[in-house]
Amino acid sequence: MQFKKSSIVSFLSLLGSLTKAAAEVRLVTMDGVVYSYQVVTSTIKPATTYVETIYYTTTYVEAVTLTNHAVTSTTRESVVTSTLSSTSLLPETTEESTQEDEQTTDFTSTTDVESTTDVTSTTAETATLEPTTSDETYTTELTPTTSVKTTLENDDSTSVITTKSTSKANTQSISRKTSTLTPTVTSETTESTSAETLSSTDKSTSTSSSSVLEPMVTNTDCQVVYEYTDDDEYYSTVEISGTESVDAATTYTKTRTVYATISS
């Protein structure tokens, strides 16, 4: 009698465990065949957009001769903006798996890659008139005039901005001096990423400025030319052989913003 009780208890326990397991598996019976379905979907980093804007702001002083032959000055700015926008769609993968009791497996994978780049550049220019030079030290008489020149040269590896301002009303003694200037560069980068807000922003700002007061003869790739007069007026240009070219009074600002969508 005790043997029968233990057998009944074991049978009931086995039946209960099988019922529980069947409920967890959630088998579907169709036409006498048992099917088990499993769908797995994953996304690998959606599209990322990069927007990069470069501003060249050149501030220069232009001499102005008034009607009473007095010479004064005015300040002007020349701004050149270059915007680079790049959108890249990284691969997006979706997996679907169907499994039957016959061990049949189907796998589907789709990948989309797209890249778009837009480049926009705008330039502001003014006219110029410069005096004739013939020697390293000389004397010349200039008619009261005002001249300003802003030139932008752009190719694959060099971008040059040259600004010139000269004006004299009397006989002046002008000497030309050549020295080398190394610009001071400061860089600041701020990065913020949040998986909960599904977005991240990466902004970096670098400012490059050069001083005309203390030239340093340390880098032959950066040439600065000064033309001094009795009133300490000067003409200076800084040319960097790399990817940047700025005037001595130019502020160079570069902003890079990254918009990224992060899937949870």
Curated annotation (Swiss-Prot):
GO terms for cellular component: extracellular region; side of membrane. One of its GO terms (biological process) is cell wall organization. It is found in: Secreted, Cell wall; Membrane. The keyword Secreted applies. Keywords: Cell wall, Cell wall biogenesis/degradation, Glycoprotein, GPI-anchor, Lipoprotein, Membrane, Secreted, Signal. It is a lipid-anchor; GPI-anchor. A lipid is attached at D247 (GPI-anchor amidated aspartate). Residues 75-92, 105-147, 157-168, 178-211 have a biased composition (Low complexity). Residues 248-264 form a propeptide. Residues 75-213 are annotated as: Disordered. Residues 1-23 form the signal peptide. Involved in pseudohyphal growth, cell wall metabolism and required for the separation of the mother and daughter cells. This is Protein DSE2. The gene is DSE2.
